[in-house]
């Protein structure tokens, strides 16, 4: 997996096996109370300082949107209950491969070296669904990793054109409040 590739100890990894995803079909179910509780219990246990979710809310497959909802629904419940751990937590949305955030909306940008970008590609390729042509391309025939790399290159070029430092690539994030 991408976690082992990046030397993340498996006891730091949480595989949720959310019920909405386990349909055996292309179309996934809507999130359920069971999905929300699984994620909420993990958040309460870990009390993360940062959460990163896919912000491709209009991806051709639709799964990113459902996954994002499965994370934000329990966060919103925790907010309503005044969970103290949320005071130190930042929620960041990133884009996958279809489009980048508009520059005026980007709130954090992380530069990547050529080696880091290659590592990102290798992590993407650890997911069997990303190794070949994705079944939900939209209007873009490139492989997922190619689209993601091109997006990261373009973001770095845009920042450089604005007079900022030149990097191989950049990953942009928008904060969810």
Model region roles, listed by residue range:
Residues 4-6, 28, 41, 80-92, ...:
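C-terminal accessory domains and tails appended to enzymatic cores
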Residues 19-24, 99-102, 116-118:
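A short acidic, often aromatic-flanked loop/helix-cap motif at beta-alpha or helix-coil junctions
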Residues 1, 37, 96-98, 159:
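Residue-level detector of functional hotspots within protein domains
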Residues 14-18, 52-54, 89-103:
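Extended hydrophobic secondary-structure segments that form protein cores and membrane-embedded regions
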Residues 1-84, 122-125, 141-142, 172-173:
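Active-site beta-strand->loop->alpha-helix modules in alpha/beta enzyme cores, enriched
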């Amino acid at each position: 997996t991408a976690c082992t590739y990046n030397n993340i100890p498996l006891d730091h990894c949480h595989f949720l096996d959310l019920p909405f995803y386990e349909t055996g079909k292309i179309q996934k179910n809507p999130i359920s109370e069971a999905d929300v509780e699984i994620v909420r219990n993990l958040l309460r246990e870990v009390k993360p300082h940062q959460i990163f979710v896919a912000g491709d809310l209009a991806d051709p497959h639709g799964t990113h949107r459902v996954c994002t909802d499965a994370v934000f629904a329990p966060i919103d419940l925790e907010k309503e209950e005044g969970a103290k751990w949320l005071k130190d937590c930042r929620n960041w949305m990133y884009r996958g491969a279809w489009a980048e955030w508009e520059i005026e909306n980007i709130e954090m940008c992380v530069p990547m070296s050529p080696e880091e970008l290659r590592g990102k590609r290798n992590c993407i390729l650890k997911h069997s669904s990303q190794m070949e042509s994705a079944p939900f391309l939209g209007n873009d025939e490139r492989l997922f990793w190619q689209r993601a790399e091109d997006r990261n290159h373009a973001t770095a070029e845009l920042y450089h054109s604005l007079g900022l430092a030149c990097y191989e690539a950049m990953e942009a994030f928008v904060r969810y409040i």
